[in-house]
């Protein structure tokens, strides 16, 4: 009888430890809110001593990002690289038009690798898959880091279409882009002030 209780107890402990092992936190943010999300969620001076294993799941709408989206993504990843440590890991998986792993567990401070993926999303993906979202979770589970904060951050880029080589469409987009670029440049110049306000 004692032996039966010992076996049952050992089995319960094993099941409990396996159920707690692979906890993956999920976050979702639109591209427009990405910089603020990074400011709020990643800070090198946090009290948390846990390292981070972050898989960014970025929506794609063509072979490349438009200029405005590239600027936002690059600024966000530059800010992130300053807000994490060398022990933290970042992976990038793309979904929607291009589904695949674009960056596999690089040092979070390696800004060159991060920016290369933003500049060349299609060529960064070596193997195209059917479902990028499912792939991101499978990849994160396979590359789970014990005693680390493992997460998938979905970056949604709504209402974008791939560039069309039509002169009318191009002219309309150029006019819209000029207005959008002014907004992006204004936001980037205000970024240090926003960060200072948040820190206070």
Language-model features: locations:
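Acidic, polar low-complexity linker/tail segments
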Residues: 2-6, 17-55, 62-69
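Von Willebrand factor
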Residues: 23-39, 50-106, 113-155, 182-199
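VWA/integrin I-like adhesion module and closely mimicked acidic/polar interface patches used
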Residues: 29-33, 83-86, 157-200
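Surface-exposed acidic, glycine-flexible loop patches that form ligand/cofactor-binding
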Residues: 44-48, 81-84, 140-148
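DG-centered beta-turn motif at the end of beta-strands
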Residues: 56-61, 92, 136, 147-172
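Short beta-strand-loop
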Residues: 89-122, 164-170
